[in-house]
C-alpha cells in the first residue's frame, strides 16, 4: 500500500508483552517459554508472555498466590517487576523508532505513534522494516499498524 501526496499517514508501534519481552531479552534461555511479571511485592500478575497466556487463564492483576502452584507445574517463570529495566528498554525502543521518522509521539512505555506522512515507500514493507530493525537493535518483538487519512 503506498500513499499519495495529499494523504496523512500514521503508524502505531506497540511492543508485544513489553515487560515479559524485556525479561526474555536478557534471559535468552526463556525466549519462547512462559514468563510472567509480577507487581511490586509480587502480589499479582501485571504482564505475561504469549506462551504464558496460552497455558494459564491469567487476567490482569490476578493474584499470584492463586496461580503460583499451577504455574510452577507448567514451567512458568515469574519475575519481580523491574521498572528501571523497562524504562531503559523503552528508551531504546523510542530511539530506534526515531531512525524512521522525526515525527513521533510516545503514547506509553511500549507504544508510539509515528507520522509517516509523505513517505514514498510501500507502507507494509516499511512496517516490516521497522519491526525487523526494532527486533535487531533491541530484541523486542513489535507490532506495527498503519492508517491513511
List PLM regions with ranges:
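Residues that scaffold, gate, or flank divalent-cation-dependent active/transport sites
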Residues: 1-113, 119, 130-138, 146-149
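Short, conserved charged micro-motifs
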Residues: 121-126
